Amino acid sequence: LQKKIVKKRPGTVGICAGIQNKYSVDAIPHILCGGFTKEDTENLLIDLDFLGIDNVVALRGDALKNETYFKPEKEGNEYASELVTQISNLNNGIYLDEDLKNSAKTNFCIGVAGYPEKHMEAPSLDSDIHFLKEKIRNGADYIITQMFFDNKKFFDFVEKCRTAGITVPIIPGLKPIATKKQLNLIPHRFSVELPDDLIMAVVKAKDNDHVKQIGIEWCLQQSKELVAAGLPVLHYYSMGKAENVKAI
């Protein structure tokens, strides 16, 4: 016999409601295409709206670990652009059931993902920006970028977006490196490049405590440059290492 340990914890709605009600901090749940039918998504959004959680980020989600490409749920949204449309429709009082009598309008502010070094499945950055523009046309209000470690990539991306006619705010996404393993993990998993100077510094580090400090200092310098350039908001990917972000 094998003992099964089950750890119970609140779901997304419960956690977000707790954050807002207990700490008066706006929660921004990620709404995914993967694993949800359109009906599931609508029900989730109705709950969030009722609780006053009106900021969301619409994402497609990744392929499952044992699959090579993303497969949408049957009767679910296949692309983030479709998910944005569904949320935007609710903002206009348009529900899946057109005959619904209590179809009150929601008031979601919708964020989407952008990729300064292009999405790993996109053939080029230009084509990726084309699809990003579609998400904006469908109702997205702002963009949060994938992590990057060279600020020039972010500034070039913003310039390309503006040239393409994208005018919504673009929030830079940052991640402090914390371990030597991440030198291989981050480029492979997120399809981003690490600057040579950062790689060499991490390779020479005597242990992960030293790596952690290098990652904090690198990310802090990025942050200072971005703020100096006029960016009003920065987004940090903690990925279970909140103390690193807190140090920054």
Task: Locate the predicted segments by residue.
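Short, well-ordered coil/turn segments that N-cap beta-strands
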Residues: Y23-A27, G52-D54, T106-F108, A140-D141, ...
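Active-site pocket-lining/capping segments in soluble small-molecule metabolic enzymes
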Residues: K74-K105, V112-E121, D128, E159, ...
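Conserved, mostly hydrophobic/aromatic
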Residues: L48, K135, G139, P172, ...
